[in-house]
Regions:
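Rossmann-like dinucleotide-binding domain for NAD(H)/NADP(H)
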Residues: 93, 226-322
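Phosphate-coordination loops involved in phosphoryl transfer and adenosine-cofactor binding
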Residues: 68, 141-144, 217, 226
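Phosphate/diphosphate ligand-binding glycine-rich loop within oxidoreductases
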Residues: 45-124, 138
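Rossmann-like adenosine-cofactor binding region
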Residues: 43, 56-61, 174-271
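N-terminal glycine-/charge-rich "phosphate-binding" loop or analogous flexible N-terminal tail
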Residues: 1-47, 51-52, 165, 169, ...
Length: 322
């Protein structure tokens, strides 16, 4: 079994790692982008554990891994070529954890909102440079938070907002808006009203072929110059180049993000990372010990179940049944 991309060698210290006792495990703490080198590295292994989307599992890679039988991971899998997995006889198992929010992601979203509204990174940098106050922040109480995506993380963030005295309004898919209304939530009348009326907008949507490029240049143009846009979900939910263009145009006035089109980025390869009206973090929304314990307990359970001949959470189950 190979575990990929454990950059800080964290997993061996988790309680759940003991579930792998009796299994020969190799943990890779670096990130390899060269397909030929990665294929050579992974060729001996029967099973892979993925660290979220840190490594893309492409058809080109899978075609060079004749021994591979299992890929175990958690949550959505846009980085895995499922068709190529099936063609190569590789079972993909992924616990979709329905009904369980990522409190780590929700808390990080709220941290970015707070940090941006109160200019915390800028104030800190200014102070460390030997200066005193450098500007005036904004309070959240009485302001409107627009949440795009009526799901588990969005609902958790809504709870934080309500505790801070914010007005919460929703938008999303037709089905999501319907669920929100049935639950007594405030839903914007139109998409344009949603973007126009909110002081802060945060996106909480899974990346699928249908949601790729969901947030457009037109949406950003509807936002006010004093508003904040937050994305801790996936960069590809935004139309390519649209956020940078929007920040340069001043609508929205600010943004806070945890996700990038290419990860990891090599500073300053992504111009968003150095934009003066943006604060950013290196995709750490899920990077807490507590979240790792939760996620990898599920991932390791899938390995054990496969080893026992009774795999769980199968995505391409047809190859197992056939």
């Amino acid at each position: 079994l190979a575990i990929l991309d454990d950059w800080f060698n964290t997993l061996r210290g988790l309680t759940c790692f003991s579930k792998l006792n009796g299994i020969e495990v190799t943990v890779f703490t670096d990130h390899e982008t060269d397909i030929a080198k990665l294929a050579k590295r992974l060729r001996p292994f029967d099973a892979l554990v993925l660290f979220r989307e840190r490594t893309a599992i492409t058809a080109e890679l899978l075609d060079q891994l004749p021994n591979l039988k299992l890929i175990s991971q958690r949550s959505v899998y846009p980085h895995v070529d499922v068709e190529a997995c099936s063609r190569n006889g590789v079972l993909l198992c992924s616990n979709m954890h329905s009904g369980t929010p990522s409190f780590a992601a929700a808390e990080h979203t709220w941290a970015l909102i707070m940090a941006s509204m109160r200019q915390i990174p800028q104030q800190m940098a200014n102070l460390q440079a030997g200066h005193w106050q450098m500007g005036v922040g904004k309070t959240l109480h009485g302001r409107r938070l627009g949440l795009y995506g009526y799901g588990r993380i969005g609902k958790t963030v809504a709870g934080y907002a309500e505790a801070f005295g914010m007005d919460v309004v929703w938008w999303g898919s037709e089905a999501g808006r319907k669920r929100a209304k049935l639950n007594g939530q405030k839903v914007a009348t139109t998409r344009s009203e949603f973007f126009e009326s909110a002081d802060v907008i945060s996106v909480h949507v899974r990346l699928t072929p249908e949601t790729r490029g969901l947030i457009t240049t037109t949406d950003f143009a509807s936002m006010r110059p004093d508003s904040l846009f937050v994305n801790t979900s996936r960069a590809a939910l935004i139309e390519p180049g649209a956020l940078l263009e929007a920040l340069n145009a001043g609508r929205p006035g600010r943004a806070a993000i945890d996700v990038f089109d290419q990860e990891p980025i090599i500073w300053p390869a992504d111009p968003l990372a150095t934009h003066p009206n943006l604060i950013c973090t290196p995709h750490i929304g899920f990077v807490t010990e507590d979240e790792f314990e939760l996620q990898f307990s599920d991932v390791f359970d899938q390995v054990i179940a496969f080893q026992a001949g009774a795999p769980i959470n199968m995505i391409n189950a047809q190859i197992w049944h056939s």
